[in-house]
Regions:
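C-terminal substrate-binding/catalytic lobe of Rossmann-fold NAD(P)-dependent dehydrogenases
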Residues: 383-384
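Conserved alpha/beta enzyme-core scaffold
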Residues: 98, 110-111, 363-364
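A conserved active-site cap/scaffold subdomain adjacent to cofactor or substrate pockets
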Residues: 350, 354-361, 370-373
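Conserved phosphate-binding catalytic cores of ATP/NTP-utilizing and phosphoryl-transfer enzymes
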Residues: 96-104
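Conserved "HGTGT" condensation-loop signature of ketosynthase/thiolase-family condensing enzymes
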Residues: 1-89, 104-111, 115-257, 263-350, ...
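Nucleotide donor/acceptor-binding cores
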Residues: 111-112, 373-375
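Internal, well-ordered alpha-helical segments in soluble enzyme and binding-protein domains
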Residues: 98, 169-173, 358-361
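A glycine-rich, Thr/Ser-enriched phosphate-binding loop motif common to dinucleotide/cofactor-binding enzymes
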Residues: 93-96, 294, 353-359
């Protein structure tokens, strides 16, 4: 038993989810509706009237609609005035951070009820725009600035070459990591297909998933008209699917308050602790692309909470915007290719309500622990392998007070090697550090992009024109990685470096 005061032990007591599939576009619920309903469902799940006492409200950033001060609008709808009322920045790790921070607030005695929620209505918003339907929602706040996303932090050459969006940046990690592990592109693709098929199996079992069907590895990795290549090696079925309408919420309280409210013990799930760390926002300022030092540090800290062994977790959620993320994560955790990487279904199949997927993953994890699992790992990630947060949750009450200082940034930074200087202009020999190939909607190659090291070991990006069939064939070969291969850099007429294989 623990000797921590029960009013300082945080517990997750309520989970709520809503999926909206309107028959008519105009009947679609706006994000504020989804948020409110998810929170009310979480309160219903807890079986105790807690929402009215919430002193902490964290709202995950959403992009499908814009409000002025959405956290205040939501608090008004709920009839509450929480001391901590927060609407955060963009980041797929943020739901895990908010759950962790709420737990810390309860452990400090600053609040006794905390709510975390997120929602997106991108499917309805997109359909309405395409059909010219005016939605009867809270008026769109055009005067509110759009939140800064990853593209805002990238170099002009990266933007010019099209490698400034998640779907075109993550392939750099995919190619570099698989080469580092000694895989051929064919082997790397097979691992992605098998892993993603496993995510789809979990989605097929999740009543809240957007796509409820199992996909075979071959269906996932084979390009077709419906599964087009977007950025090598990623097809549509390997990337996040943001066209969903979903809301998710969790309620936390103290163990003392949960017991006083008569909440059943079998409902309680305990946050044991976690960790966070970040990479530079500009991905070209990182030392390499075959691993992430912050990801490693965060997952190792989570393992330490589980006795130092990743196999101690009997339920895990590895963030899944693109295959390289859980592929890197499972190796750091010491887990094999037979890993069961999700309790939710993944951002492709469950759906990607942008920043708030991990809210749904946390709900699914609570269900899994209530159903018999003992120790769970929630790992969220944001940006371009940029922001990392892990949280360990348990069916058993903690033996130690929740640790307040949970950044492992120093551990991550300690492993940084020298970062090569970036140059926007280069000539001479160039060695491939990583690469991708960008495709148009019709399946045609637009151009390749190689990340290179120059002869004096500086870093640049270069284009491979669609007309250079020999170099593109070299990049797209399945039995030998082009990472590490040598070629010639020349400046094109538009002042962009171009690379041709030697």
């Amino acid at each position: 038993m623990t000797n921590i005061p029960e009013d300082r032990i945080p517990v997750i007591v309520g989970i709520g989810e809503i999926v909206d599939r309107p028959k008519e576009i105009a009947e679609g619920l706006e994000p504020l509706d989804l948020l409110e309903q998810a929170l009310r469902r979480a309160e219903q799940d807890a079986g105790a009237k807690l929402l009215g006492e919430a002193q902490s409200l964290d709202l995950v950033n959403f992009l499908s609609w814009r409000y002025r001060d959405p956290e205040k609008l939501l608090a008004q709808r709920l009839g509450i005035s929480p001391a901590h009322c927060h609407y955060g920045p963009v980041g797929g790790e943020s739901p895990i951070r908010y759950i962790h921070e709420a737990a810390k607030r309860i452990a400090r005695g600053e609040c006794s009820v905390a709510a975390i929620c997120g929602a997106e209505a991108q499917s309805t918003a997109t359909k309405a725009e395409r059909a010219g339907v005016k939605l009867p929602w809270t008026p769109f706040a055009h005067d509110v600035e759009e939140p800064k996303r990853g593209a805002a932090f990238q170099k002009p050459l990266a933007v010019k070459l099209g490698v400034f969006r998640p779907v075109t940046v993550y392939p750099f990690y995919e190619a570099a990591s698989s080469a580092h592990w000694g895989q051929t592109p064919r082997e790397a693709m097979a691992e992605s297909g098998t892993l993603w098929s496993r995510y789809s199996e979990a989605a097929a079992e999740n009543p809240n998933a957007w796509l409820k069907r199992r996909y075979t590895p071959e269906e996932i990795t084979t390009p077709t008209a419906d599964n087009r290549l977007i950025a090598w090696p990623y097809n549509k079925l390997m990337v996040a699917n943001p066209s969903v309408n979903m809301g998710g919420a969790l309620l936390l309280t103290s163990l003392a308050k949960a017991r006083a409210a008569g909440i059943a013990e079998d409902k309680l799930v305990y946050p044991l602790g976690g960790a966070s760390a970040e990479e530079p926002r500009d991905y070209l300022l990182r030392d390499q692309f075959y691993e992430s030092h912050p990801q490693n540090a965060v997952l190792k800290a989570a393992m330490d909470l589980a006795g130092g062994d990743g196999k101690s977790f009997d339920a895990i959620e590895l963030y899944s915007c693109f295959p390289c993320v859980p592929k890197m994560a499972r190796r750091t955790l010491g887990l094999g290719p037979d890993v069961q990487p999700t309790v939710t279904g993944g951002l492709t199949f469950f759906g990607a309500p942008l920043n708030t997927y991990m809210t749904h993953a946390a709900c699914a994890m609570v269900r899994r622990l209530r159903d018999g699992a003992k120790l769970g790992l929630l790992y969220g990630q944001g940006g371009f392998v940029t922001k990392h947060h892990a949280l360990v949750v348990s069916k058993t009450a903690p033996r130690e007070v929740l640790v307040q200082e949970t950044s492992v940034q120093a551990d991550a930074d300690r492993n940084n090697r020298a970062v090569p200087e970036f140059v926007a202009e280069a000539t001479g020999k160039g060695t491939v550090e990583s690469f991708t190939v960008l495709y148009g909607r019709g399946g045609n190659i637009e151009h390749g992009v190689v990340m290179l090291r120059t002869e004096d070991d500086r870093r640049t990006l270069a284009r491979v024109p669609a007309s250079d069939g020999a170099t593109l064939a070299h990049l797209l070969a399945m039995d030998r990685t082009p990472v590490g291969s040598l070629g010639e850099i020349a400046m094109a007429e538009d002042n962009v470096p171009e690379w041709r294989v030697a």
